[in-house]
């Protein structure tokens, strides 16, 4: 299987909306190459600085690189994406450039790794690629060694970062956790590092379960986390203190009642993957079911909600 790399050079004002369009149409990640970074060589909010190569960046504006499965990226999808981008009010249509290239499966396996380096995803958690060596900068730093494979995110998406921040705030060692749609297993590993002893990781995709198990092994918790195939919480009979779901909004909407029923009294539903246009509907549904919304995070057009199961 090959991959299509769609490369778009646009103005800064259109980056956020353009990125959302690409992700909503199924891009397996979006790389952002900002020409301003060459000038500023900025350090991130946790103090890390990376050496940047001029040849990797456009002369001006921002280059977005989106990756699509060649089997599903057809003329119809190509035109739909282009039409939506060109309809953005924020887009400078005089300076937009589109290009494509095919990346063979064997090249793709290594191409995405060029953009994945250790980074601090939240106050406590640092994500470390399995092929890199990293030394902790502080005693309280918790490192998650990750090899997401080609089909799963690297942990740098805003929804993952917000979930990690919520885990830092609400998950305690004495809690039990169920991670719905575990993907790479990153949120289960984070819960383990907090000290949680009972963790169950579910995913409907057996490949995800396999990838998660391998990442659990890398983080020395493969015997401590139960990783199993599962269709949301439809067949779940156990009770947990924490339900975590970083998945798409319409799927979250389907599982809100099941999440409430799965939680012990006083438990927390940590959920993200919600675009800002849909979060009010998700929040209202959670409140109707009985959740008290105790936290709301926004980051780059995405929202993370934390609801607590409380008695009337």
UniProtKB/Swiss-Prot annotation:
<keyword id="KW-0963">Cytoplasm</keyword>
<feature type="binding site">
    <location>
        <position position="246"/>
    </location>
    <ligand>
        <name>S-adenosyl-L-methionine</name>
    </ligand>
</feature>
<keyword id="KW-0949">S-adenosyl-L-methionine</keyword>
<dbReference type="GO" id="GO:0005737">
    <property type="term" value="C:cytoplasm"/>
</dbReference>
<dbReference type="Pfam" id="PF06325">
    <property type="entry name" value="PrmA"/>
</dbReference>
<dbReference type="InterPro" id="IPR029063">
    <property type="entry name" value="SAM-dependent_MTases_sf"/>
</dbReference>
<dbReference type="InterPro" id="IPR004498">
    <property type="entry name" value="Ribosomal_PrmA_MeTrfase"/>
</dbReference>
<protein>
    <recommendedName>
        <fullName>Ribosomal protein L11 methyltransferase</fullName>
        <ecNumber>2.1.1.-</ecNumber>
    </recommendedName>
</protein>
<feature type="binding site">
    <location>
        <position position="203"/>
    </location>
    <ligand>
        <name>S-adenosyl-L-methionine</name>
    </ligand>
</feature>
<feature type="binding site">
    <location>
        <position position="160"/>
    </location>
    <ligand>
        <name>S-adenosyl-L-methionine</name>
    </ligand>
</feature>
<keyword id="KW-0808">Transferase</keyword>
<comment type="similarity">
    <text>Belongs to the methyltransferase superfamily. PrmA family.</text>
</comment>
<dbReference type="GO" id="GO:0016279">
    <property type="term" value="F:protein-lysine N-methyltransferase activity"/>
</dbReference>
<comment type="function">
    <text>Methylates ribosomal protein L11.</text>
</comment>
<keyword id="KW-0489">Methyltransferase</keyword>
<feature type="binding site">
    <location>
        <position position="181"/>
    </location>
    <ligand>
        <name>S-adenosyl-L-methionine</name>
    </ligand>
</feature>
<dbReference type="GO" id="GO:0032259">
    <property type="term" value="P:methylation"/>
</dbReference>
<dbReference type="InterPro" id="IPR050078">
    <property type="entry name" value="Ribosomal_L11_MeTrfase_PrmA"/>
</dbReference>
<dbReference type="GO" id="GO:0008276">
    <property type="term" value="F:protein methyltransferase activity"/>
</dbReference>
């Amino acid at each position: 299987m090959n991959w299509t790399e769609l490369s778009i050079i646009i103005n800064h004002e259109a980056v956020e909306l353009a990125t959302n369009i690409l992700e909503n149409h199924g891009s397996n990640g979006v790389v952002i190459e900002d020409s301003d970074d060459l000038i500023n060589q900025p350090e991130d909010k946790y103090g890390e600085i990376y050496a940047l190569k001029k040849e990797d960046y456009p002369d001006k504006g921002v280059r977005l690189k989106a990756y699509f499965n060649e089997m599903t990226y057809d003329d119809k999808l190509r035109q739909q994406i282009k039409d939506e981008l060109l309809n953005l009010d924020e887009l400078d249509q005089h300076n937009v450039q589109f290009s494509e290239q095919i990346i063979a499966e064997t090249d793709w396996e290594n191409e995405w790794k060029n953009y994945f380096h250790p980074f601090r995803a939240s106050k406590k958690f640092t994500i470390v690629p399995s092929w890199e060596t990293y030394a902790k900068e502080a005693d309280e730093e918790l490192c998650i060694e990750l090899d997401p494979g080609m089909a799963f995110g690297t942990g740098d998406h805003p929804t993952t970062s917000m979930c990690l921040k919520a885990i830092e705030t609400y998950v305690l060692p004495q809690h039990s956790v169920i991670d719905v749609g575990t993907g790479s297993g990153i949120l289960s590993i984070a819960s383990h590092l907090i000290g949680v002893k009972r963790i169950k990781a579910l995913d409907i995709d057996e490949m995800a379960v396999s990838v998660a198990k391998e990442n659990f092994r890398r983080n020395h918790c493969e015997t401590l986390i139960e990783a199993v195939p599962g269709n949301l919480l439809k067949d779940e009979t156990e009770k947990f203190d924490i339900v975590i779901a970083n998945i798409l909004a319409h799927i979250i909407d389907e599982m809100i009642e099941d999440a409430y029923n799965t939680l012990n009294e006083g438990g927390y539903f940590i959920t993200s993957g919600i675009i800002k246009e849909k979060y009010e509907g998700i929040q209202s549904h959670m409140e109707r079911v009985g959740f008290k919304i105790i936290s709301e995070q926004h980051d780059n057009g995405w929202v993370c909600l934390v609801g607590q199961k409380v008695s009337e």
